Amino acid sequence: VRAAALLLAGSLLAGAGAARAQAVAVPFYSAQHWVEGLYRHGLAPDAAAFAARAAALPAAVGTRCDAAGAAAAPALDQARAQWRDAMLAWEALAALPIGPLIERRALRTLDFTPARPALIARAIEAQPADAAAMERIGAPAKGLPALEWLLWTSPVAPGAPACRYALQVAEDLAREARALVAAAAAEPPRDEAQLATATAEAVNQLVGAVERLRWAQIEKPTRGGAEFPRTASGATAQSWQAQWQAIRARLRMPASAPPTPGTGLLPVETWLRGRGLLAEADVLAAAVDVADASLRGLTPGAGARLSAAAQALAGVKQVLENRVAPALQVRIGFSDADGD
């Protein structure tokens, strides 16, 4: 019943969206406009936002390591808050892994899930003291999940070897974030062959992003096959929302006027409307609105709502695969280029 209600609501919202789109002149957009929008107005600013928050992690963790007496607890709270800020910025950036995120295998390097406590313990014993030493530490023992484990599951004590290692993990995160900013500043693909590859990659990664949120993060944990993401920090719901909002921004046409070609982030719906593919745009808008309603306020303890959300996300995936990709002449294929 709830799923049917969500579908009806989504259809009504999509109808309103279609009427709005017809009332607003939508210019023609090329694949180059779409790809440039993803890189310049999505990837680049999101990488900068993540780097800014990751840059504050070493100082926050270092303060915890140096704290004494009554200052220790507030220092841990501050380190945890800074981790949450960095994590949410990362979720927005990593929601659509394209370009340098794939080339640098950033999802594996920065977000290997779940963290491996035994490997973290081994890394603490090794006591890496600089960037070169951290390169020899495997991804399962560092990155955001490992730091979450060190701040919540087994909170590092001031002055302890584990705290010194947590500081190295934080510094490693900040370094990789800076490297992503530099990589994201490169010119987006322009020649015909590169553009075709980048377009196909981005469409496929959008499908993968929706499926990752649906299965790995929501449905699989409900079946006991995995833990909900960010459970230790209690930030699961925030993580889901950060990912979904980033995905939605790349799919759904906003209420504001469509961007002049080449000047902003271009949602897929807007791109479709600009190319006259109105039926596909309407179906996509309806599916996204159903998912948006089902994900709003969703928490790990939401019971049947979790299944409804997973079903709604499956609907978005099906529209992307069966309607959007063919309309854009993009072939959907399986890729294990990134992630774990």
Regions found by a protein language model. Give the residues of each.
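N-terminal leader/presequence-like segments
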Residues: 1-6, 22-26
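Bacterial N-terminal signal peptides
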Residues: 4-15
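Sec/Tat signal peptide C-region and signal peptidase I cleavage site
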Residues: 17-21
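Mature extracytoplasmic or organellar-lumen-exposed domains after removal of signal/transit peptides
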Residues: 23-340
